[in-house]
Amino acid sequence: MITKAIYPGTFDPITNGHLDLVTRASAMFSHVILAIADSSSKKPMFTLDERVALAKKVTAPLKNVEVLGFSELMAEFAKKHNANILVRGLRSVSDFEYEWQLANMNRHLMPKLESVFLMPSEKWSFISSSLVKEVARHGGDITPFLPKPVTKALLAKLA
């Protein structure tokens, strides 16, 4: 049986924490779509096309992972791609409340859409794209937190 899961997010930029979760999800499901939200309201540093390109580059070794951009409701995107599982990462208890609300809204919009929550590996549990960008803006070392092509792209954006 093919199980298709979606791992949605803004991924601005994709971090080693995101890569850890998508790698683990790819071992659990037949097909994983890394769905990158347009999120223009968040004013991302990278364009949607740039985020998709970076994610494709760093997930290339994961043969069952597909990277797509989207701008519609997640439930609509899931229906369009015949997926009924959402993978979400939970770094802390504070993430849970927001994720719980999203999961319930998505289930309301698409009753067969299940949310699966994964804990990050301990070494990535404190990482977020926003935090990494802030460290980079102040000249801190971001190399431990991002795949090499992403580090290069982020430093180029800030130059």
Swiss-Prot record:
It comes from Yersinia pseudotuberculosis serotype O:1b (strain IP 31758). InterPro entries: Cyt_trans-like, PPAT, Rossmann-like_a/b/a_fold. GO terms for biological process: coenzyme A biosynthetic process. The gene is coaD. Its cofactor is Mg(2+). It is an enzyme of class 2 (transferase). Substrate binds at T10, K42, M74, R88. Homohexamer. Pathway: Cofactor biosynthesis; coenzyme A biosynthesis; CoA from (R)-pantothenate: step 4/5. This is Phosphopantetheine adenylyltransferase.
